[in-house]
Amino acid sequence: MENLPFPLKLLSASSLNAPSSTPWVLDIFLTLVFALGFFFLLLPYLSYFRCDDPPSPSPGKRKCPVGRRRRPRGRMKNHSLRAGRECRRGLEETSDLLSQLQSLLGPHLDKGDFGQLSGPDPPGEVGERAPDGASQSSHEPMEDAAPILSPLASPDPQAKHPQDLASTPSPGPMTTSVSSLSASQPPEPSLPLEHPSPEPPALFPHPPHTPDPLACSLPPPKGFTAPPLRDSTLITPSHCDSVAFPLGTVPQSLSPHEDLVASVPAISGLGGSNSHVSASSRWQETARTSCAFNSSVQQDHLSRHPPETCQMEAGSLFLLSSDGQNVVGIQVTETAKVNIWEEKENVGSFTNRMTPEKHLNSLRNLAKSLDAEQDTTNPKPFWNMGENSKQLPGPQKLSDPRLWQESFWKNYSQLFWGLPSLHSESLVANAWVTDRSYTLQSPPFLFNEMSNVCPIQRETTMSPLLFQAQPLSHLGPECQPFISSTPQFRPTPMAQAEAQAHLQSSFPVLSPAFPSLIQNTGVACPASQNKVQALSLPETQHPEWPLLRRQLEGRLALPSRVQKSQDVFSVSTPNLPQESLTSILPENFPVSPELRRQLEQHIKKWIIQHWGNLGRIQESLDLMQLRDESPGTSQAKGKPSPWQSSMSTGEGSKEAQKVKFQLERDPCPHLGQILGETPQNLSRDMKSFPRKVLGVTSEELERNLRKPLRSDSGSDLLRCTERTHIENILKAHMGRNLGQTNEGLIPVCVRRSWLAVNQALPVSNTHVKTSNLAAPKSGKACVNTAQVLSFLEPCTQQGLGAHIVRFWAKHRWGLPLRVLKPIQCFKLEKVSSLSLTQLAGPSSATCESGAGSEVEVDMFLRKPPMASLRKQVLTKASDHMPESLLASSPAWKQFQRAPRGIPSWNDHEPLKPPPAGQEGRWPSKPLTYSLTGSIQQSRSLGAQSSKAGETREAVPQCRVPLETCMLANLQATSEDVHGFEAPGTSKSSLHPRVSVSQDPRKLCLMEEVVNEFEPGMATKSETQPQVCAAVVLLPDGQASVVPHASENLVSQVPQGHLQSMPTGNMRASQELHDLMAARRSKLVHEEPRNPNCQGSCKSQRPMFPPIHKSEKSRKPNLEKHEERLEGLRTPQLTPVRKTEDTHQDEGVQLLPSKKQPPSVSPFGENIKQIFQWIFSKKKSKPAPVTAESQKTVKNRSRVYSSSAEAQGLMTAVGQMLDEKMSLCHARHASKVNQHKQKFQAPVCGFPCNHRHLFYSEHGRILSYAASSQQATLKSQGCPNRDRQIRNQQPLKSVRCNNEQWGLRHPQILHPKKAVSPVSPPQHWPKTSGASSHHHHCPRHCLLWEGI
């Protein structure tokens, strides 16, 4: 008895020493007295509440306490409402209590017995506490009961919200719940269940979720009041919700009514289980007392009190009615049943403090005593211990479940905080409470959940994991939930020790499978004490856990398959704990052993799958690393190869296959670096590879690599087996081949993959070659190149890859650039139309070269296939148009063969100093675009058009951008050459040159843009005769305009110059400078001057006064004039009419021939003779051009090889010039004012701004016409070239004559003043015919007269 807790000792002594009848009667009467006292105590509160209640009609009850009137009315009203509700509840409970007492006492109780029952008290410890309860007068118990029963109606803050009562701390230690108990206390279950006190649902806001038979096993009435207990917390609002009876703590010596008396501490102590303070103390005290309580105490107690006493006491229920005795029997029987079941469940929890055999013996003795007690009692209405003990494998088979369910759901539906069920360990904890308290708070009890705390004595150093994670999620003292279908589950001490040993290692295992477990896991006992550690699975905060549990149970249909997977798991992951059965699941997991084993096997399988995912992630990382280092390098350094690293994670076969295909198809630009470190001599390696040693293994390995994994089908066992097999194979294979790989040998599988790549070499190489011009849209070419050239050095492959990337980027941006170029051109402010015409007209070389250079450029620029067709149509149009335009021209027929004597320039050699007669002429030939309205203009184009044909043949792929750049460079060079005039001298010597040198980019852009508009120009050009004029720079630096075919745009530029100027501009400039300096030194009247645009116009005007008014020919087309003026905007010569150009050729080209050396070009001398003859003829009178003169010129052109033919040519040219100049002056008189107002610029002054007045369309038409004429005149180039050398000697005489003519005209021999045929020299005298007009150049006059 020394180890028996104080309450139990008190109860045992009181129950054994007191008479059987007196305690019952006394307790019943005391209870009645307390109920009445509680009622009277509530009367003042009722009157106060009715006073505050407006609907109350009673005026007598409106008298409220004076002290309470000072409180705010709103506060008093709220308080009154709450107190009224509580008072009504108390009254209802009191009435129910009285009715229950009356039914229990029946006729055995009268008023005379009331006073007698309040006197006697048992001696001993109980007697010491008697003054607190039974020894007091009838009035005192009423007063003392007030704090016990009245709080229901008291204004205490705890009553403010009934649902918060569960969270309030208990008034005092739970040991006080049994302090006033005596032997005279009646058993609690003596009250009938037929008359329960309806507990207000407000106090218990959480209804039960699931009916539990155990919850229905002991449903005591809530309104039941014990004997007067001042310190008891029996019926206080914070404890009345936890009324329960102890299960498994009743000593065998106690009779049924004494067992119920012993349950009073449970009734009083459970009230604060929701309270954190009371629950904490109760938790700690339970741990202390549970360790001290053992079976020896029970055995000693049984030895001192034989069962006969119990039987006698059981048969002494004479005061109870039959219903009361039935209730007592039912409750005692269920208590014993629950004790037996609890002992079975807790047998593993008491292993350290008491052996299961000793505890089972005590329970067995208790069952036997109860059975004997039942046999001796008369009524056995509901229970038979012998039968029920055999039929109770678990709490689900309790006797008469209908009665318990009915009583529970009807009267106590909200008894236990709304939790699913009342767990027995909560009652056990309250029954084992001692007066010792702990400072460390324990979590509240949980019901119908697994327990993670063993009912052993705890220290203040309890693991805080229980209390820090989730206070409401941890379990109470250990007991198994009632969900097991096999009650034979008993965790062995070995399993518990294993659970304790592997608890820490189970956390990482459970982390992927059960993420909710870690949050709710608590270590109940420190590991240093070798206590059982378990996991908690709270249902209250994780309601999905039952569903998960059912799902896990349902997925265990294949235990054999899971067993195999477990075996595989033990092989593939040997680092896991071998004894991980209890580490995966807690020892208290509510399943049978068989189901537990299957569940753990399933969890292991799930973990294996999860680790497989982690392995895949690791393999993907290895693959990423594989791209940065080759297999040979990683193996040579002693590191595990990427395949080995991928095999180690369990997915080797699949990832190795990926690696293999990645090596074959990986578009990574660094693939060349990976392959660059492999052996270079593949043939030698393949021959020297030891196939006999590695052949079988490698082939098997390759088959395994190509074999699809069956893990996708869900066969985990096969997947694991295959993975292990492949891993072993690969490890052996890689270990065997490691040295060979380092020596430069290649495994069979790698060799085969390389062979496949080598077989694809021709295709890949072809693709790369064809994509050089096609500009691939993706990087496949780079990849194929790297694979094909994998044997190259890494640096070489990098350079090649960089080149291919640049090439690919260049072609990718080709089309956008082609679109941006025209946009930039049109956005330029008043872009030069002449540059457009110059660049627009495709050179004869471009037209003739066909698909040679143009197709190549088209592919480079990604032109559509129609580009070639467009070029073909353009070439055909060019072939046919000149014939229709020039067929009716007698002059053209006459001068078709005239250029035979003109020497041709070197077609393929670099720039060389041309003959003296041609030195100053060729730079101006790109300025030869012109549209004229007369076919007669072609008569002066014979020589130059023939020479254009020769140049076209010599330069088949010459492009206009080169011409433009060359012209710009020449202009910059001409500034240093005093006698040299740049291509822009058609209007002024300075302004056109500046335009070219400042914006050569525009010219290049315009050329490329015009090429895009060539088809649109074809139709417009076919209906217009096209004759161009060229500025001929004579040896002394003077410039003249010579009409010629528009094809001379490119043809008149020397091939050598075109080839050398883009790269050797300075060389050409120096040569030109030397030539011009030599020519100027040989001229007598020559003086170096700066070119002036106004000088040429003034110097030329005196020569044409008679012609200015002589003739009125047809009005030129406005479009033609605009195109002529358009030419002034670029370095090239503006389009002019044939008369004006011819006149300039006559008047300007003859001037510098005075002191030409014999080496001067015969063509230049011939031109000088022509102009000399014309001007000599003009002195007398300008003669109109007649048909006879044209025929004469035509006949003389046939014998052009002689000087007489040259003289005839000069005569014809002079007649043509006279006619055109007269037309120019006649039209100019009536239109000059209109021109001035329209353009707001001088017609002939510097700078001439006509170049800003025209549009690009005219230039495109002009360019197309020029290209057409070039194509036609191609055939005439070769014979003219042959005749050039033969005609050089006869032309020398003409040169001499020109020199003599120049002596007669000293005023026009100044080279600097006659530089520009557009702007006359300023020192020229003005004629009377031009006095009324602006100073202008004859060419501009011709251009403006038709507007």
Swiss-Prot record:
One of the record's GO cellular component terms: membrane
Keywords: Differentiation, Membrane, Spermatogenesis, Transmembrane, Transmembrane helix
Region entry Disordered, spans: 55-87, 106-233, 373-397, 628-657, 900-955, 1084-1161, 1313-1335
Organism domain of life: Eukaryota
Record localization: Membrane
Gene Ontology terms describing biological process: cell differentiation; spermatogenesis
Biased segments, Pro residues type: 198-211
Skewed-composition ranges (Basic and acidic residues): 1108-1127, 1137-1146
Any Pfam family matching the protein: DUF4599
Biased composition (Polar residues): 165-178, 631-651, 927-948
Entry-linked PANTHER family: ACROSOME-SPECIFIC PROTEIN (PTHR21859), SPERMATOGENESIS-ASSOCIATED PROTEIN 31A1-RELATED (PTHR21859:SF55)
Functional summary from the UniProt entry: May play a role in spermatogenesis.
UniProt record similarity statement: Belongs to the SPATA31 family.
Name of the molecule in the record: Spermatogenesis-associated protein 31A5
